Every structure is written in C-alpha cells, then in structure tokens.
Design a protein with these regions (language model features):
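Context-gated lysine
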Residues: 6, 15, 29, 46, ...
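N-terminal capping/small domains of soluble enzymes
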Residues: 1-99, 104-109
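Alpha/beta enzyme core
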Residues: 94, 106-257
Length: 259
C-alpha cells in the first residue's frame, strides 16, 4: 500500500482512508467471497449491543425509485458472543486492517459496560458509538439529537476506553454542529457522518409505513453535512454508508476542500 495513502483518525493510523460502513459489511466474513477485508484501512462491524437482538420482523427493506428504505432493528449476537465466537471478533482480528467495533445501547450504562470489556481486547483498535439509529425504540438516536446527552454518553465511554472513539451522528437534526461539538467535548476523537435519514414509503396493499433512508439520494445530503461541519470545526469526519462506483470522491472532496 502506497505510503501516500496513510492517514490518521484521531490517534489511530490507517494504511488508507477507506473504512467499511457499519451495517453494510457485516463483520467481514459476509463479504470475503468477493473482497478481501484486508484491503481497507479499517473495517467497522455491524452494531453490537449488550444482549443479543433479533431485530425487526420481516420484511426489513423496501425499494423506492431513489433509494432503499430499511428497518433492520440492529440484529446482532450480543457482546458475549461477539468477543468469544470465532465468527466475530476473533475472525475480524485476523484481517490485516484496523478493527472498529460499533456499539449501540439503550442506556449509558450499557455503552459503558461494553466499552470496559472491549478495552481489554487487544484486537479492538477503536469504538464507533451508534447514537443515531432511528430504528430502535430506546437509545440510539435518543442520545444523538440532544447535545448534553451526547456529551454525557461519550464522556462516560471515554472514562472506560483508552483508544480511539468515533461518534456516529444522526442527520435528523436541524443543526449537526452542536451535537458534534458535544461529542468532541465528551472526548470523541473523530466523527462518523451520517447514519440513515428518517423517511417513509407506504405499502398501499397493507397500509403500513416503511422507514429509514439510505443510498442514492443520501449521497446528495451527507456531503453537505460533512462539508458544513468541516468548515465549522476543521475536523476529520469519516463518511458513512455504501455508495456505488466513484461517488466516494464527492465525500472526500467536500472534506478536503473545506480545510
């Protein structure tokens, strides 16, 4: 890997600036048949909670003309299985790349307990705090829309985790800057912009809503969030979600142009 691609994310050195987005990449093993996770600067695993979660009932996705609606519900094996099961953290640690563990919880104490346990796992290079998921009844976005709640949560995790902390922010606020500053004040080393947008389509056959938006139209909104915040704080802001072909250039461009 070319030396010129090396970059830093807080105190964490990456061999290149490309990281997988949480939720789109599973835990690495899901994509091994068509891409080697080791080519990335880091892999960000799907969200992990203190206890296992089954996720939302099927169907969980809904295609629209301009993007995909999803309501996965944070299905995951829980922190115990994530640490001990060979399919999860042990397998992620075998890749030649940085390992970022995405955490989600209903309470501050849940985030703290997971951070405390992962601090003793040498394979974990960084935490990404999911304080922005719109598809869960408790926690998640409840923290990420309130600057003070964001600061308290990040601060509590910072006291229990000694390495890099990334706060994953929500776009579903009027102004993301106060949330970003609160995360920074709490001890976050970097920000991940942004989680899915709240959206709704209606299944007219069942008269039911389909929620949470990602993909094509999101790539027109998320660069604005990142560029606006970069101009405000001149921070490194990792982008979130998966995009086809050369669209990633729009994201890196909006950051570098603003600095």
């Amino acid at each position: 890997m070319a030396e010129t691609l090396k970059t830093r994310l807080g105190s964490l050195e990456l061999k290149n600036p490309i990281l997988s987005a949480s939720g789109t990449f599973g835990y690495g093993k899901e994509v091994e048949s068509f891409v080697d996770p080791s080519v990335y600067g880091g892999i960000v695993g799907k969200s992990i909670s203190l206890e296992p979660r089954k996720g939302n009932p099927l169907p969980r996705t809904w295609e629209t003309a301009s993007g995909m609606l999803n309501s996965i519900g944070l299905q995951n094996p829980g922190i115990d299985a994530f640490i001990s099961d060979p399919s999860y953290l042990p397998r992620m640690s075998a890749y030649d790349t940085r390992v970022v563990v995405n955490l989600v919880g209903d309470t501050v104490d849940e985030y703290v307990e997971m951070a405390r346990r992962l601090d003793s796992e040498a394979a974990v290079d960084a935490l990404e705090l999911n304080i922005s998921c719109p598809n869960c009844p408790l926690g998640g976005m409840e923290f990420g829309i309130d600057p003070e709640a964001t600061r308290r949560l990040v601060e509590a995790v910072r006291e229990n985790f000694s390495r890099t902390i990334i706060a994953k922010l929500t776009p579903n606020v009027t102004d993301v800057v106060p949330i970003a500053r609160a995360a920074e004040a709490g001890g976050a080393d970097a920000l991940s912009l942004v989680n899915t947008y709240v959206a709704m389509a209606v299944d007219w056959r069942q008269r039911r809503p389909r929620q949470s938006f990602s993909h094509q139209a999101k790539r027109k909104n998320a660069p604005w969030q990142s560029g606006f915040l970069s101009r405000s704080r001149h921070e490194q802001n990792p982008q979130s979600n998966g995009y086809p072909r050369g669209n990633a250039r729009q994201f890196t461009g909006c950051i570098h142009r603003s600095q």
